């Protein structure tokens, strides 16, 4: 279901149902979106050359933390871009080539969270002898020690269907047992610890949404409390998203569980099984915390199993 006239949209999109190709089709509505068909050309690009549009690619990698500085980006396939691609490939357990191969492009084009990937990697060994993949924000911010309850509220506009609110309430409940914090909905948006907003394109922070596909949502580190979802997505708030006739449908609860992890202080994980993995394909349900998520939140809040 969507925030627009979802019944009419469902009928319209269902008539256009088609099988997904090997590369997801993502419309280039914003600075961080990719066009599925046009992106194939990137496989022919080679370092040391100049290609129109690479400045936008560099901006994309800058937004996600792979290029730390933000000069006036040019269209040269230079060492900066090669380094960014290699780091990205390593982070996603891809073959490290420094080039835009098919698997790298497929990963780039998978819809994702808008929070940067490069923050702080713990690089610690867990009690099971495995290397952890969870990360934290800079300086490891968290909610104050001893916090047992946080309030959350939905923006008065746009008004949300109760199914949307229920999906997000379920998402909060996934974190309560491992962080020992209860989440209570309130009607006071201005005073709530966590403020939830569905918005389109530019919406008052430095991270505009890009229309359907691309960036699905983002949330800010503690104790900011802002949590935003792209209102232009086709959100499924109830029912089985895996059976949706809409190929671009996203499970709201799944994305919300991820964004709440950011609200609590977790960065992204390179563990594909983790809730905090940055990307999620359409028609996918993923709501249960993985061990990496649990280890990360316990490390941050000093909670023992």
Curated annotation (Swiss-Prot):
Q: Which CDD domains does the UniProt entry name for this protein?
A: ZnMc_MMP
Which cofactors does this protein require?
Zn(2+)
InterPro entries listed in its UniProt record: M10A_MMP, MetalloPept_cat_dom_sf, Pept_M10_metallopeptidase, Pept_M10A, Pept_M10A_Zn_BS, Peptidase_Metallo, Peptidoglycan-bd-like, PGBD-like_sf
Single GO cellular component term: extracellular matrix
Residue positions annotated to bind Zn(2+) are 113, 258, 262, 268
Question: What is recorded about the protein's domains?
Answer: The conserved cysteine present in the cysteine-switch motif binds the catalytic zinc ion, thus inhibiting the enzyme. The dissociation of the cysteine from the zinc ion upon the activation-peptide release activates the enzyme.
Protein name as annotated: Metalloendoproteinase 1
Q: What would be one Pfam family of this protein? A: PG_binding_1
Q: Which residues does the record list as glycosylated?
A: 95, 123
The job of this chain, per UniProt, is described as:
Matrix metalloproteinases (MMPs) or matrixins may play a role in the degradation and remodeling of the extracellular matrix (ECM) during development or in response to stresses.
Q: Which residues form the propeptide?
A: 29-133
- Give the family this protein belongs to, as stated in its UniProt record: Belongs to the peptidase M10A family. Matrix metalloproteinases (MMPs) subfamily.
EC numbers, comma separated:
3.4.24.-
Looking at the keywords, is GTP-binding present?
Answer: no
Catalytic site positions: 259
**What does the Swiss-Prot or TrEMBL cofactor note state?**
Binds 1 zinc ion per subunit.
Alphabetically sorted, this entry's keywords are: Glycoprotein, Hydrolase, Metal-binding, Metalloprotease, Protease, Signal, Zinc, Zymogen
Tell me the classification of the organism that encodes this protein. Eukaryota, Viridiplantae, Streptophyta, Embryophyta, Tracheophyta
State the Gene Ontology BP annotations. Answer: collagen catabolic process; extracellular matrix organization; proteolysis
- Cite the GO molecular-function annotations of the record: metalloendopeptidase activity; zinc ion binding
Annotated transmembrane regions: none
Claim: Nucleus is one of the keywords in the record: no
PROSITE patterns to which the protein is assigned, alphabetical: CYSTEINE_SWITCH, ZINC_PROTEASE
Xref: SUPFAM superfamilies = Metalloproteases ('zincins'), catalytic domain, PGBD-like
Top EC category: hydrolase
Motif mapping: Cysteine switch:
111-118
